[in-house]
């Protein structure tokens, strides 16, 4: 029984002045691709044995609602696909940044920014890999709450 308040997508956003330009979508073809991917579809397909069927997929909102909690993040976050978080902020479309991805999963800012190599040197992690890390992560607050519950059950 979780009694806390959910964190909305709008609450985890960086100030627009801190968001690098590469996260803003200005390419019309990319925006149209997102529109298609997030829209409803009925596509005739043929299986490997020749059986024809209709693949159907319901539509999603054109962009993520900033007043709702973020959806589940996948390792493909940040690429052009149906599951990527697409934001519409101040009349501009954009993707979430690695810091926002960390916040969405309840990690500290820049948690994934650097890594230690086997030779001991510290190197920067690419934004793509940072998004992959967060798509592969569990929301830390949820894990913590599960741990508290298990401890409580063991004590009783």
Sequence positions of predicted segments:
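C-terminal target-recognition/interaction regions appended to catalytic cores
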Residues: 1-156
């Amino acid at each position: 029984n979780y009694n806390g308040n959910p964190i909305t997508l709008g609450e985890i956003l960086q100030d627009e002045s801190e968001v690098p330009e590469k996260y803003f979508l200005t390419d019309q073809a990319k925006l149209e691709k997102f529109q298609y991917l997030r829209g409803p579809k009925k596509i005739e397909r043929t299986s490997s044995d020749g059986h024809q069927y209709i693949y159907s997929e319901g539509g999603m909102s054109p962009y993520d609602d900033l007043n709702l909690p973020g959806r589940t993040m996948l390792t493909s976050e940040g690429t052009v696909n149906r599951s990527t978080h697409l934001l519409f902020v101040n009349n501009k479309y954009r993707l979430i940044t690695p810091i926002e991805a960390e916040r969405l999963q309840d990690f500290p800012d820049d948690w994934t920014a650097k890594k230690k190599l086997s030779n001991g040197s510290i190197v920067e992690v690419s934004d793509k890999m940072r998004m992959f890390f967060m798509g592969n992560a569990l929301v830390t607050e949820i894990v913590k709450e599960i741990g508290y519950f298990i401890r409580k059950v063991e004590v009783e």
